[in-house]
Amino acid sequence: MTHTTDVVIIGTGPVGLFAVFQAGMLGMKCHIIDAQEIIGGQCITLYPEKPIYDIPAYPKIAAEELIKQLELQAAPFKPVYHLNQQAIELNKQDDFFEIKTSKNTLIKSKVIIIAAGAGSFGPNKPPLANIEDFEGKSVFYFINDKSKFAGKNIVIAGGGDSAVDWAISLSEIANKIYLVHRRDKFTAAPESVRQLRHIAETGKIELVTGYQLNALDGNNSELQSVIVKDLQNNTRKLDANILLPFFGLKQDLGSLANWGLNVKLHHIEVDNSYYQTNIEGIYAIGDIAHYAGKLKLILTGFAEAASSLHHAYSRVFDGKALHFEYSTTKYGERK
């Protein structure tokens, strides 16, 4: 089946969904492609219950709720979703691009917005003997239902945002949390680190710094303890039912890497004015985009979506100038 639209957006994470809204506000029709069966990207697939603290007007919002609200915001513009399929082939035809998906869907558009986050993703697993025996029962790389960790003794490994944020969140329901990190300094947001250290003073979280994961001990997929080791090879046994290793994601751009885009370390290089790639009419926004001074924040991706689509307006509408209007005016006219 062949479709024709104004904009194709690759990725249905928060930035991709906000791009749908921005395009709609500018009168552009959108088709969206995502490899997952449901919309939401990493927010839904990896951490639907994870609290997000840096969305304006929301002191705290769960990832799944953010996706729900973004979907509702985009819905009036009637986007067409092509889920459970990947964008695998790109062809340029006169003023149009043609994308072919893994389900042989063909979509023609004048503009492409790549908001694919980390691309295809999977966890970086710690090199522990027999860890696969515990996966899915005692060892988890993603959390989609934190209630199952209530009353548990949990080892969280890592020093970034995911490790610190989950330690804070799970401390409300867990019996005990050990946060294992090879250094005393954490790379999470400073305010999150401040909260972490405050909770650690109460004893709900124990900071096990200067140590790394060394071994797992248990029977029949039931974890009983986690062995950690410091730089002097001194070991310590942590009594725990659950291990949550948060060492980031493996990234793979898949077929996007073959589209002639400038790619560096699994990211797409863009200009930092309008986030256009080296191919005119193709933009990259959100975590997949790279430029000097890039901040990997959801709100940064929102701004990139707005800028790129305002810039793309003249291409979609054959050189027509865009006269800026505030959303209250535009939405009022739509109603």
UniProtKB/Swiss-Prot annotation:
Pfam families: Pyr_redox_2 (PF07992). Its EC number is 1.18.1.2. Signal peptide: none annotated. Its cofactor is FAD. Binds 1 FAD per subunit. InterPro entries: FAD/NAD-bd_sf, FAD/NAD-binding_dom, Fd--NADP_Rdtase_type_2, Ferredoxin-NADP_redctase_2. It catalyses: 2 reduced [2Fe-2S]-[ferredoxin] + NADP(+) + H(+) = 2 oxidized [2Fe-2S]-[ferredoxin] + NADPH. FAD binds at D34, Q42, Y47, A87, F121, D287, T328. It is an enzyme of class 1 (oxidoreductase). One of its GO terms (molecular function) is ferredoxin-NADP+ reductase activity. SUPFAM superfamilies: FAD/NAD(P)-binding domain (SSF51905). Homodimer. Belongs to the ferredoxin--NADP reductase type 2 family. This is Ferredoxin--NADP reductase. The lineage of its organism: Bacteria, Pseudomonadati, Pseudomonadota, Alphaproteobacteria, Rickettsiales.
